[in-house]
Design a protein with these regions (language model features):
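Ligand-binding pockets and gating/stacking loops
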Residues: 1-233
Length: 233
């Protein structure tokens, strides 16, 4: 059993996207182009890997042997909104189709490897992510505030009364779905079941970053972005 557990842990996959909206440009951090007319104002420093990065990231420089910098990416999208959509989905905006974000696609493809998950597989901290597109609302991002709070998730009823209401609702929805009301009704039922699991799951403790020791909060950064990174960990 222990060997199987270790093997499962190795095979589990996840991805973290740090979306630095409004952050510094690439020529100020990753690709300084020293000596070039298009270069940035900062000096490059050597790292633990092969690349040089900005002088203002000495701690990141120590981890560059674990990193890969992609400098060949380009786009013709000049509008920020369209560019953001492109970066989150891999597709240029098209009025005829709504593409799913990377988080929705990864969740859809890898969910069978994460059977132990009681929380949604796609989480966005602070909102702002692109939605599930044509994959449907069952793969929509679960939004958590940077302090770990989730709106409307606290149980306002005693357990017995809540489960009685959920059982009655499930009966009504099954009748609704049996009338072939479409995918939206089935997705709604799935989301309700996930919500109930969330309200009772111990895995929700992962979002309570304010319970972390002060030194851990300071290490990640005791701010919205740092807390988001800590949750992702």
């Amino acid at each position: 059993l222990q060997l199987n557990a270790q093997d499962l842990k190795k095979r589990r996959k996840s991805a973290i996207l740090l979306w630095m909206g409004g952050g510094p440009s690439t020529m100020d951090i990753w690709d300084l182009k020293p000596g070039a007319a298009t270069g940035g104002p900062f000096k490059p420093i050597s790292t633990s890997g092969d690349a040089q990065i900005s002088e203002h990231m000495p701690l990141m420089a120590k981890q560059m042997h674990n990193m890969a910098i992609i400098r060949s990416m380009s786009t013709r999208e000049a509008d920020h909104g369209r560019g953001r959509y492109y970066m989150h989905t891999g597709y240029v905006p098209n009025p005829n189709v709504e593409h799913p974000s990377y988080g929705a696609v990864l969740s859809h493809e890898l969910i069978e490897q994460r059977a132990e998950l009681e929380i949604p597989p796609f989480v966005t901290v602070g909102g702002g992510s692109i939605g599930p597109g044509f994959l449907g609302m069952a793969w929509a991002p679960f939004t958590v505030n940077s302090d770990g709070r989730v709106r409307n998730l606290e149980m306002g009823l005693e357990d017995d009364r809540l489960y009685q209401r959920m059982a009655a609702l499930d009966l009504i929805e099954k009748g609704f779905i049996s009338q072939k009301r479409g995918l939206a009704a089935e997705n709604h039922q799935k989301i309700l079941k996930k919500t109930l699991n969330l309200m009772t799951s111990e895995q929700m403790e992962a979002f309570k970053v304010n319970k972390e020791p002060a030194e851990i909060l300071e290490r990640y950064g005791n701010n919205n972005f740092g807390k988001g990174c800590l949750m992702a960990r």
